[in-house]
Amino acid sequence: SAVAIEVLLAAVGDPFQAFATGLLLGVVEADQPVLLAGGSQMAAVLALALQALPPSARQGLSNQVLLGTTSWLAAECLQASAGPSSLMVLLRNLEQHFSVSLQAYAAGLRFSNSRQSRLRDFEQGHVKEGVGAGGLTLLAQWRGLPLSRLVMACDRAVDQLLAHGQHGKAAP
């Protein structure tokens, strides 16, 4: 039997997803563009909003929303296959289910040239972020900030965090 959205969200979601879904529903009337910074979590929010709309309004919302994520999450495959990434499969399934076209972008930030081994670990798939880093990086890219500058800033931030940690102080 079908599960009510509210029951599903209460069981496996979090309060922010409900808030973000409400925000998206408000976007329909405000006619404003929105960047959802996240991978599958924000795809879930978009799916909740699309489900709450009548079919005739779904493509309108899809036209206003961009999903932005990191290149690592965009390329991640959860199954041992050489096919499309798990996020791409999820987005295609949403497009088919709701009969919409979705827009998703992956930021170009890579840490392979970082001084910090902790950041280079992203390239090995050892680290997952979940703080909207892809969306923020995309905004910086679209504003013309060179990715090399972002990598240097991230290196400096790790230096500062490590320096504060060695002195027994909490990082700022």
Predicted segments, located by residue:
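N-terminal loops that bind phosphate or other acidic moieties
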Residues: 1-172
